[in-house]
Regions:
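Acidic, low-complexity intrinsically disordered segments
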Residues: 1-172
């Protein structure tokens, strides 16, 4: 193994450990606070995955939107998809986030993490999940968003109750 490859591996591991440490501190603070906030204006905060139609072999861009936002700073969202039909390519941040990190968490599973400097108060797109529709895929395939009880919080570390809406990929 070359020295360059060793440096890349060590840097990648260090970056991953820093991300996990920040996530751990955030989650510990949420669990300690025991506070929960519901969406403002009497509505519900919703994280929804868009639906897309395309043919096999095509690359698709699937939006992940956030509506009913009472003001949120931290996001930890899991996604499940059919790995037999879709190949995960990458994630692009949406207009609501300054940055986000996504890790593959096994076959057909993704985890998105973002921590902003302060509460984001707008509604819009959190991120875009980029996939390729695999050859042989047919029919409909679901992309499921999963938000646990403490997956979204505000600057004051109060958990925000979030409903999720799954998206559908239709193969033409």
């Amino acid at each position: 193994m070359s020295k360059k490859n060793l440096i890349i591996i060590i840097s990648s591991v260090a970056a991953g450990l820093i991300l996990l440490g920040a996530l751990g501190i955030w989650l510990v603070n949420i669990f300690k606070s025991g506070n929960k906030q519901s969406a403002g204006s009497g509505g519900n905060a919703v994280i929804s995955v868009g639906s897309v139609s395309a043919g096999t072999g095509k690359n698709i861009r699937v939006p992940v939107s956030f509506t009913g936002n009472p003001g949120a700073m931290g996001f930890f969202i899991e996604f499940e998809y059919d790995a037999n039909s879709l190949e995960y390519l990458s994630t692009d941040k949406g207009e609501l986030l300054t940055d986000c990190e996504v890790a593959e968490a096994g076959s057909g599973k993704l985890k998105l993490v973002s921590v902003e400097d302060g509460d984001v108060k707008k509604e819009g797109t959190l991120a875009y999940l980029n996939f390729k529709i695999k050859d042989g895929a047919a029919g409909k395939s679901e992309i499921k968003a999963i938000c646990g009880e403490n997956s979204v919080c505000n600057y004051d570390e109060k958990a925000i109750s979030v409903k999720t809406e799954n998206g559908t990929i239709t193969v033409k």
